[in-house]
Amino acid sequence: MLLLRWFTSCCLWVFGLGQLEQTELSVTRETDENVQISCIVYLPYFSNTAIHWYRQKTNQQFEYLIYVATNYNQRPLGGKHKKIEASKDFKSSTSTLEINYLKKEDEATYYCAVYSSGFHKVFAEGTKLIVI
């Protein structure tokens, strides 16, 4: 099974397809709850790849949020309350964005991204967060 996953990752990497996947198109949470948004990374060198997270609010430009380079290199945003955190799980080749203490203004579409072939940035499909 591991060999199949590696082969698929390599083929997708060569053709530049399917490098990132956000399986949930949308998630709904209530105010003051937390949410986790996952991004599966189909790259042969996941452990050395920095995963970047962005959001886009309705009718606004992309906003850069956070990146994670290794499992121990999280860069929390939001002071002591850690409003936004990012992490990597090497076993599942997944990066997770966690947004805590949700407010209505957190409503947006969230995207993971990686740099591919130098300076070419590849984005996943995005996950729309709805806060009620």
Swiss-Prot record:
The protein's name: T-cell receptor gamma chain V region DFL12
| One GO CC annotation | external side of plasma membrane
Question: Which stretches of sequence are listed as region V segment?
Answer: 19-114
Native source organism of the sequence: Mus musculus (Mouse)
InterPro entries of this UniProt entry?
A: Ig-like_dom, Ig-like_dom_sf, Ig-like_fold, Ig_sub, Ig_V-set, TRG_var/const_region
The ranges of region (J segment) come to: 115-132
A Pfam family assignment: V-set
Which keywords, in A-to-Z order, does the entry hold?
Adaptive immunity, Immunity, Immunoglobulin domain, Receptor, Signal, T cell receptor
Q: Which Gene3D superfamilies is this protein grouped with?
A: Immunoglobulins (2.60.40.10)
Q: What SMART domains does the database record attribute to this sequence?
A: IG, IGv
Q: Signal peptide position in this chain?
A: 1-18
Please indicate which superkingdom the organism of origin belongs to: Eukaryota
GO BP, one annotated term: adaptive immune response
